[in-house]
């Protein structure tokens, strides 16, 4: 899949996408198997978007409050970094800007709790 010129132009300033997991990459629901294993439903289209971003030089980082093995596995599959157990996402954003030398205006954040 190739990014259209129109979308590419709009995204020129974006160097990094930060996204929450629960409620953004999932529907917010939690499922448990009979053995009490946590399960989450991820949308395949979101995975395709992360792949498309990577192919076009835009990294994706997952920021999540939870410490879910399921979320870690999803990040690994999509070759995205994940920071879990993050209670203060604004503080983590500031830390990432400094460590990665990225201006906040060059970051797209997708979340339901900031």
Label the model's feature ranges.
Residues 79-87, 106:
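Short hydrophobic/aromatic-enriched beta-strand-loop microsegments
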Residues 6, 49, 92:
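Short acidic active-site motifs
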Residues 66-67, 87-88, 111:
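Short beta->alpha linker loops
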Residues 93-114:
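Conserved Lys-Pro-Asp/Glu-containing loop-to-beta segment of HAD-superfamily phosphomonoesterases
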Residues 1-21:
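Non-catalytic pre-domain segments flanking phosphatase-related domains
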Residues 13-15, 58, 105-106:
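Short coil/turn segments at beta-strand junctions that form active-site/ligand-binding loops
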Residues 50-74, 83-84:
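Substrate-recognition element of Asp-dependent hydrolases with the DxDx(T/V) motif
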Residues 25-55, 65:
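A positional/architectural concept
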